[in-house]
Amino acid sequence: MLAGDAFAFLDPVFSSGIFLALRSGEMVADAVDSALTDGDLSAGQFSEYSEQLCGGIEAMRKLVYAFYDKSFNFGHLLDKYPDLRGDLTDCLIGNLFRDFDPLFDAIAQFADIPRPLTYGGPQRKNI
């Protein structure tokens, strides 16, 4: 089981990586507790943990990329999409483990948003 920076590294300046490292530690502890309680330590037992954490990392990663994009401005985003204020607030305070597609679709109109990373598989380059 991987958690924190061992699972994925995210921008240290924005401090979101610290939050995700601590939160992933809590999440993995809950997943291990459930697996031990159920007597099932198979990989499938931990898929929910992995999917939730990957989704949270991707949400924060997109927000970090937008933050550093010189053409992006939170004020302009909220002027055009005031109904997304709650989604943006949730994302900024760490409520990352839900669907933020409408928010990031709107942000993509102002900033370049990265494609999702591949997590958990071997990262090899063909030589």
Where are these regions (language model features)?
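Conserved mid-domain beta->alpha element of the FAD-binding
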Residues: 1-59
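C-terminal helical "tail/cap" subdomain of flavin- and related membrane-associated enzymes
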Residues: 33-127
